[in-house]
Curated annotation (Swiss-Prot):
Job description of the protein: Involved in the synthesis of the GDP-mannose and dolichol-phosphate-mannose required for a number of critical mannosyl transfer reactions.
UniProt name for this protein: Phosphomannomutase
PANTHER family reported for this sequence: PHOSPHOMANNOMUTASE
Family per similarity comment: Belongs to the eukaryotic PMM family.
Alphabetic keyword roster: Cytoplasm, Isomerase, Magnesium, Metal-binding
Length: 252
């Protein structure tokens, strides 16, 4: 057993990052760090996010691989256990360049034809296990992200674009998952956040808790939140996460 030092080594608590451990794209608070330190003495902890590890380091700190027992970047396609890297998967190897080029050409053409209040840079971000598509671009400032999120709720830009992609590529075997404030992920069906659970099977956890803020249908926490292997906790903010952790695990 890898976690014999814990009070309850058969319980794993997994967290989404944006909106759950940190405000969207911002850094972790001292209060959250202290809460997680207390929690880690009792149980096994990990995070699972769609971003790559470099962005998770920006948000959760440079010692992230040591601060969590499990670190799952890109939904677990890149994975670490106790600081050691586990086997990884590649989106481009799975889809192939021919299909990938068709997908990207359609996305860029679609984005050029829609009316948006602003455009910045990095509309398609290529990652190891997925692509991330942002109509206004990932280089938007925090204020621009907040403004766009309100605009998107009114005009359903991402939702409409996802439907257009599903219609254009019905046989590509892709899932489209809206997450964060300004973007959505595109990845092979089955490579959602439940993908990370295969990395923890060898520990035979009796309880796996998951905390996430996008647990509604179409949100990028939906599949793992509703998976029969997990106990789902829907949160509205990092403060909400701390409150539920204190109540559930008696941390105070």
């Amino acid at each position: 057993m890898s976690f014999a030092n814990k009070q309850d080594p058969k319980t794993l608590v997994l967290f989404d990052v944006d909106g759950t451990l940190t405000p969207a794209r911002l850094t972790i608070s001292e209060e959250m760090k202290k809460t997680l330190e207390k929690l880690r003495e009792k149980v096994v902890i990990g995070f699972v996010g769609g971003s790559d590890l470099s962005k998770q380091v920006e948000q959760l700190g440079p010692n992230v691989l040591n601060d969590f027992d499990y670190c799952f970047s890109e939904n677990g396609l890149t994975a670490y256990k106790l600081g050691k890297e586990l086997a990884s998967q590649s989106f481009i190897n799975w889809i192939g360049n021919e299909k990938y080029n068709k997908l990207v050409k359609f996305i860029l053409r679609y984005l050029s034809d829609i009316d948006l209040p602003i455009r910045r840079g990095t509309f398609i971000e290529f990652r190891n296990g997925m692509i991330n598509v942002s109509p206004i671009g990932r280089n938007a400032s925090t204020q621009e992200r907040n403004d766009y999120e309100k605009f998107d709720k009114q005009h359903h830009i991402r939702e409409t674009m996802v439907e257009a992609l599903k219609k254009e590529f019905p046989d590509f075997g892709l899932t489209y998952s809206i997450g964060g404030q300004i973007s959505f992920d595109v990845f092979p069906t089955g490579w959602d956040k439940t993908y990370c659970l295969q990395h923890v099977e060898d520990e035979h956890f009796e309880n796996i808790h998951f905390f996430g803020d996008k647990s509604y249908k179409g949100g990028n926490d939906y599949e793992i939140y509703n998976d029969p292997r997990t106990i789902g906790h829907a949160v509205n903010s990092p403060d909400d996460t701390i409150r539920i952790l204190n109540e559930t695990f008696k941390l105070q």
